[in-house]
Amino acid sequence: MGIIAQNKISSLGMLFGAIALMMGIIHFSFGPFSAPPPTFESIVADKTAEIKRGLLAGIKGEKITTVEKKEDVDVDKILNQSGIALAIAALLCAFIGGMRKENRWGIRGALVFGGGTLAFHTLLFGIGIVCSILLIFLIFSFLTGGSLV
């Protein structure tokens, strides 16, 4: 317990970084947690029903009532943003711990956990970009009748 008491900032950075990394891995493995977005057909059906109700109310001379829908909380976006914020907080704690001349293992632990979390998110984003580019090439190749080679 004495080591943690001497290295409060870097130990806090390791805790932030470890929580952020676990959140990122669990969210990637078991997510998405929010409800899927509505389909295009349901959006069009809702809009046409609203137009029909508005036209009928206008013809009858009634007052048109509009219902404002609340936007749902996007749990996935909150998890991603909070994980990145915790990783940045871990890197800041590592920097402050280094300025305070705390123990190296605590500083390096905070750097590894915080940097690992940011690298994990960057790697996932990069894989998504590469896969989307390959998919576009595959679609163009299929449409033009050419080969990928």
Swiss-Prot record:
Keyword annotations: Cell inner membrane, Cell membrane, Membrane, Transmembrane, Transmembrane helix
Membrane topology according to the record: Multi-pass membrane protein
Membrane-crossing segments per the record: 9-31, 78-97, 118-140
Gene Ontology terms: cellular component: plasma membrane
Side of membrane Periplasmic, spans: 32-77, 141-149
Naturally occurring in which organism (per UniProt): Escherichia coli (strain K12)
Cytoplasmic side: 1-8, 98-117
Subcellular location: Cell inner membrane
Entries under InterPro entries matching the protein: Uncharacterised_IM_YidI
Name by which UniProt lists this protein: Inner membrane protein YidI
Source organism superkingdom: Bacteria
